[in-house]
A protein has these predicted regions:
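Bacterial N-terminal signal peptides that target proteins for export
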Residues: 2-14
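Sec-dependent signal peptide cleavage junction
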Residues: 20-32
């Protein structure tokens, strides 16, 4: 091998080494789940999935449809409308869920919930029997009958009934605000626009869960949500989400 070829070969190895050294930390960082965020400019199929073709049953009076999850004007919108695809329910809802699971850390969302009696707009973490794990869940839920309030809740091994309703002092459906929860081994602290408004310290969930958002109408839960009047279409809007391991 002549000197020129040796120099070219060495240069190629140096470039390859630089690229590997540059890319590996980024990949490792992403896989470590230390930070995750999405500005919802478009669908990201590597990170998220649209629920499609099934119903949760029970109090969920809708079938999830991928067509009810859309990305427009730099945000994601979930739609509630009449189901035209012959499902087992009269309505179609939108649900978006992360492909990966996440554990202790700070979860944040900027969103505008839908406003109408009988419906729920949500941001939450979930794992359960469908994932071959106990049912653990942490919720931020807006009951469309009164979007000047937000409801916080959590489930540990399927046990819930920890509802707490916080009076926001504004109508959440009219503009984007940031809602969050900091989940740690010994507590969960919910925040609104960066200010802690509720904290719990008993029977804290421990299993990693998927980040989820959905919009759905209720049935048989009028005492909680109010009676759904069938109004469609309705939309909940999500500007961005983030997770930071803490």
């Amino acid at each position: 091998m002549n000197k020129k070829k040796i120099i070219i070969s060495t240069l190629g190895m140096l470039i390859a080494t630089f690229l590997v050294a540059t890319l590996i930390p980024i990949q490792t960082f992403a896989l470590s789940n230390a930070h995750f965020s999405d500005g919802f400019d478009s669908a990201n199929t590597q990170a998220w999935s649209k629920s499609d073709g099934w119903s949760n049953g029970s109090m969920f009076n809708c079938t999830w449809r991928a067509s009810n999850v859309n990305f427009r004007n730099g945000a994601m919108d979930l739609t509630l409308n009449k189901d035209s695809q012959g499902g087992t329910t009269p309505y179609a809802g939108g649900e978006y869920r992360s492909n990966d699971t996440y554990s202790y850390g700070l979860y944040q969302v900027s969103m505008k919930p839908a406003k109408n009696t009988g419906i729920v707009s949500s941001f939450f973490t979930y794992t359960g029997p469908s994932d071959n794990t106990p049912w653990d869940e942490i919720d931020i839920e807006f009951l469309g009958k009164d979007t000047t309030k937000v409801q916080f809740n959590y489930f540990t091994n399927g046990v819930g009934n920890h509802e707490y309703v916080y009076n926001l002092g504004f109508d959440a459906s009219t503009s984007y605000h940031t809602y969050a929860f900091n989940w740690q081994p010994t507590y969960i602290a919910w925040k609104v626009d960066g200010v802690e408004v509720h904290r719990v310290t008993n029977t804290i969930p421990s299993h990693p869960g998927k980040i989820m958002m959905n919009l759905w109408p209720g049935t048989g839960v009028d005492s909680w949500l109010g009676s759904y009047d069938g109004k469609t279409p309705l939309n909940a809007y999500y500007d961005w989400v983030s997770y930071d391991q803490q």
